[in-house]
């Protein structure tokens, strides 16, 4: 049963690839735009220039079970990104259930493998992977955004059926929320994913994730992650802390 309870968490790593590679910001402002122009601008940003310099993030992971407090655990991981296609990690600290560290290692192993295999193209928010529909203009954390509906073109666990918040000024993705297009197991009724993004030292990164799985028989389980710290290549190699990534935007 423990294997069943943790299997869904691999999805979180695959979905996280949507934003695991930061993009250099282009904050060009646009006037009133048509729906197609919004999607065009979003796609241009998705395919924008990737960071050339290596960087490191410190992530905090929390695993919890709504009906099972013994599943609760807390893990801190150090993740190194080396463009164009290299990722490695180290677990810094782990407490609570040993299941937490096992799950986080599976998540990060999947991320490392997907990075080296170039699989991130299959999760990009573009017309190759999704059909879009315009919902309206909204404000998210004080930022004006276009809210678009997402309908995956394929039934794959790496794609999300839901909504995307696109920054009205930069056309970068600020948030994605929805259910995975396909669950990898009969044991999983559904998996809901929420991803958040923000600027860290001029690079647009996925800063948080919440994945909630409705597991048959044993009930819901939740995995969350957030960036605690971001370090440039020079700072990471010296071991000096540069800044916290969970500041208010």
Region locations from a protein language model:
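Bacterial N-terminal signal peptides that target proteins for export
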Residues: 1-13
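Structured extracytoplasmic
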Residues: 25-161, 168-172, 181-191, 203, ...
């Amino acid at each position: 049963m423990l294997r069943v309870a943790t299997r869904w968490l691999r999805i979180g790593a695959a979905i996280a690839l949507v934003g695991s590679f930061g993009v250099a910001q282009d904050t060009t402002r646009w006037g009133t735009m048509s729906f197609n122009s919004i999607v065009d601008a979003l796609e241009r940003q998705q395919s924008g220039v990737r960071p050339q310099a290596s960087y490191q993030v410190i992530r905090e992971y929390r695993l919890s079970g709504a009906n099972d407090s013994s599943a609760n655990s807390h893990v801190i991981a150090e993740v190194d990104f080396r463009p164009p296609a290299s990722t490695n990690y180290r677990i810094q600290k782990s407490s609570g259930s040993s299941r937490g560290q096992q799950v986080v290692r599976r998540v990060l192993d999947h991320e490392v493998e997907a990075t080296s295999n170039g699989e991130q193209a299959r999760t990009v928010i573009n017309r190759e992977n999704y059909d879009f529909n315009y919902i309206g203009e909204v404000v998210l954390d004080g930022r004006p955004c276009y809210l678009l509906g997402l309908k995956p073109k394929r039934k794959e666990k790496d794609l999300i059926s839901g909504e995307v918040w696109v920054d009205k000024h930069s056309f970068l993705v600020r948030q994605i929320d929805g259910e995975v297009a396909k669950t990898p197991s009969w044991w999983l009724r559904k998996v809901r994913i929420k991803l958040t993004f923000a600027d860290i030292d001029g690079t647009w990164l996925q800063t948080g994730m919440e994945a909630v799985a409705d597991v048959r028989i044993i009930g819901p389980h939740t995995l969350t992650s957030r960036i605690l710290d971001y370090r440039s290549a020079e700072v990471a190699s010296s071991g000096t802390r540069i800044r916290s990534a969970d500041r208010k935007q």
